[in-house]
Amino acid sequence: MAAAGLVAVAAAAEYSGTVASGGNLPGVHCGPSSGAGPGFGPGSWSRSLDRALEEAAVTGVLSLSGRKLREFPRGAANHDLTDTTRADLSRNRLSEIPIEACHFVSLENLNLYQNCIRYIPEAILNLQALTFLNISRNQLSTLPVHLCNLPLKVLIASNNKLVSLPEEIGHLRHLMELDVSCNEIQTIPSQIGNLEALRDLNVRRNHLVHLPEELAELPLIRLDFSCNKITTIPVCYRNLRHLQTITLDNNPLQSPPAQICIKGKVHIFKYLNIQACKIAPDLPDYDRRPLGFGSCHEELYSSRPYGALDSGFNSVDSGDKRWSGNEPTDEFSDLPLRVAEITKEQRLRRESQYQENRGSLVVTNGGVEHDLDQIDYIDSCTAEEEEAEVRQPKGPDPDSLSSQFMAYIEQRRISHEGSPVKPVAIREFQKTEDMRRYLHQNRVPAEPSSLLSLSASHNQLSHTDLELHQRREQLVERTRREAQLAALQYEEEKIRTKQIQRDAVLDFVKQKASQSPQKQHPLLDGVDGECPFPSRRSQHTDDSALCMSLSGLNQVGCAATLPHSSAFTPLKSDDRPNALLSSPATETVHHSPAYSFPAAIQRNQPQRPESFLFRAGVRAETNKGHASPLPPSAAPTTDSTDSITGQNSRQREEELELIDQLRKHIEYRLKVSLPCDLGAALTDGVVLCHLANHVRPRSVPSIHVPSPAVPKLTMAKCRRNVENFLEACRKIGVPQEQLCLPLHILEEKGLSQVAVTVQALLELAPPKQQQHQLSAV
C-alpha cells in the first residue's frame, strides 16, 4: 500500500513538471480549460488562433495583434473570411502584406503597425473598399504607385524610411488624413494640391527645406511641419482659412521671424497678410489668383462664412445667420435693373418726342448753346444712346456748325481725352439727318397715278442721294480740319499768352522791388492801386495763371510783399492796375480768337486772393525765406534773396562734407564699408557703440545686436544702444554742447550733429591712433 502511494505521488509530480515545462503527456490535452498550468504552449497558441479566426468569420473583425507572426496563419483557409471588414495585424514580424489579406474584398480597415514590411504587393488593389491603412513603424523606403489607386481616407506611414512621396499621391481624392512623419522626405510633390479633401497633414521630423505653395488651396485643419529645415512660410498660406492648429517648432524660420512664430497662429497669419499687402504687385500668378476678395483690407476683415469648420482667423461672427451670406445684397442686385429701367424710360421719352415733332419740323437756329448741350450729350452717353439721339430732329441748315463751335468741340476733345468726341458719330449723325430731311421734304402721297413715276425716278433719286452724301462728307471733313487747325492755333496762342503774362509780371515785380526803398507800404497805397498780382479776369484760366504768377514771384524773391489775410481786401472790378491794363498780356487775351471766354464773365469775375494757391504761395515763401511772417513793410530785395539762397547752399555743402567725413571716420576705424544710406545704417546704434568701444574699450558694456532670426532690432533696443553710445561719449569727455540728441540718430534727421559728436569723440582717442587716422583721411 505504501509503495502504491509513493508511485502515485511520483506520477503526479512528473505530470505537473511536464505541464510546467510546456510538454504534453500521451493522451492528455493541455490547455487553458484543463486547469493545469497557464496555457502558453503551442497548443494554446494554435487554439487561440483558431478562436480568433472563428470570431472573424462570425463578426467580420480579425484581430491577430501581438502574436509574433512571420506569415499569415495557415488555418485561415479553413474559415470563410471574405466578409472581413477590419483586420489588425499589428505588432508582428510580417515582412510583407500577406496575400491572403489582399483577398478580403470587403476590408475597410487594415492595421499593419510595427511589422517588418519592406514591400507592398500589387494585389492590394483588390481592396477597393479600403479606407484606413496604417503601415507605420515598418521598413518601407517608397510608397508604391498602386497604393495611390485605393479609396483611402486615412493613410498613416510614419516611422519608415521614406525618401519621397510619389507624384501619383494626387490621385487619392478622398484622403482626409496623411501622416508621413519621422521619415527622410526631402520634398513634397506639387500634386499634393489635388487632395481636395485633406484635413490633417503631418510631415513632422523629415528633411524638408521648403513647403509647397499648393497646400494653400487645401481645406487643412491641422498642419504639422515641425522638426524640419524650413526657413520661410509662403505668403499664400494666409489663405488657409480653416486651419485650427499649426505646429512649426524646431525650424530655422526667418519669415515670419521667430519672435512672431512663438506668439501663435494669429500673429503668424497677420504677418503673412501684411507681407501680402506689401508685395502684392510683385507676387507670382499663383499667389494672385482670384479669391473673392477685393483687397488686403477685406481679407483682414472678412465676413465670409466658411461652414462649421472655421479657424477663427479672418472671420467675424456678425450674428448674420442668413443662407444668402455669399449672395449680393438687395441694393446692389437691384441696381442694374433700375439703371435699365431709367435707360428704357429715356429712350421711350425721346421716341415720343420724335413722333410729336415729326408732323411739324422745328428749325433750330443752330446756336452755340443748343450745340453745347448736344455735344455734352454725345460725350457722356453710350453708343446706344447716341443712336437714339440720332432720331431727334435737327435744323436743315448744315452750315450752322460754325468754325468757332467746331473749334470749341475740338478743344474739348484735346483737353478731355478721357471722353473724346467721336467724329465718326458726328458724321453719321449728319448723314442720317440729311437723308431723313431730304426724304421728308420730297415725300408725296402714294397714289395709284404716281406709282409709275415713282419707279421711274428711283434711279435719279439714288444718284442724287449719293452726290448729296459725298458733298456732305466733304463739308464735314473740311470743317473738322478747320477745327483742328483752330485748336492748334488756340493752344499756341494760349502758351504765348502765358509767357507774355509771366514776363509782364516779372518786369512789374522787378520795377516794384527797385522802388521798394522809396515806398513804405506799396500794397496799401490806394492812389496807384498797384499790386504785384494781376487781376484774375485778365487770365484764361482761374488757377493756372495765378500759380504761374506765384512761381514768377518765387524766382524773384518778393514773398514779403504778400499781406496777411486779415489785412488784405479784394480789389473791385474797377481797381485794376493801370500798368497791367496796358500790358501786352491783357491785350493779347482780349484780342485772342473768337473762342475765348465771354466778356461778361471777364468783367464779373472777381479777384480771390484767399484761394488755396494764394495761401500755398505765401506759406512756401514764408518757410523758405524766414522763420516767421514778415510785415508788409519789410520787403526784401533781389540781392537779399540771392544772399539767403547762397547761404543755404553753402550750409548744405558744409553738411554734406561733415557727413562724408563721418562715413570716412567710421569706415577707417571699424574697417567696414557702410551702405549708401548712412542714416539707416546708424539708426540702431550698433555701429556707433562699436566705435565708442574702439576709442575706449568697454566704454559700452552691452550692445544689442540683431540675429539671423530677428534681423531688425526693436525701437526700444535701438534707443538703448543710442543712449549707451551718448553716455559713453559723455564719460570719455565729449563736451555737452557737442553731443547730439538721440532723435538725431533714431530719426536720421541730424547726421551733421552726429558727425560733430563723432569728430569730438575721435579727437579724444589715443594720440597714435588719432595721428594715423588723420593722415589716412
Curated annotation (Swiss-Prot):
Subunit structure: Component of the DOCK7-induced septin displacement/DISP complex, at least composed of DOCK7, LRCH3 and MYO6.
Region (Mediates interaction with DOCK7): 56-290
Protein's name in the database: DISP complex protein LRCH3
Cellular component GO terms, alphabetical: cytoplasm; cytosol
Record function comment: As part of the DISP complex, may regulate the association of septins with actin and thereby regulate the actin cytoskeleton.
Originating species: Homo sapiens
Sorted UniProt keywords: Cytoplasm, Leucine-rich repeat, Phosphoprotein, Repeat
Residue spans of the LRR repeats: 56-79, 81-104, 105-127, 128-150, 152-172, 173-195, 196-218, 220-239, 240-264, 266-290
Intracellular or extracellular location(s): Cytoplasm
Residues bearing the modification Phosphoserine: 324, 415, 419, 611, 628
Chain spans, region Mediates direct interaction with MYO6: 382-648
Gene transcribed to yield this protein: LRCH3
UniProt cross-references to PROSITE patterns, sorted A to Z: CH
A biological process from GO: septin cytoskeleton organization
Biased composition (Low complexity): 635-645
Region entry Disordered, spans: 568-590, 621-653
Pfam families the UniProt entry points to: CH (PF00307), LRR_8 (PF13855)
Region forming the signal peptide: none
InterPro entries in the record: CH_dom, CH_dom_sf, Leu-rich_rpt, Leu-rich_rpt_typical-subtyp, LRR_dom_sf, LRR_domain-containing
Gene3D superfamilies: Calponin-like domain, Ribonuclease Inhibitor
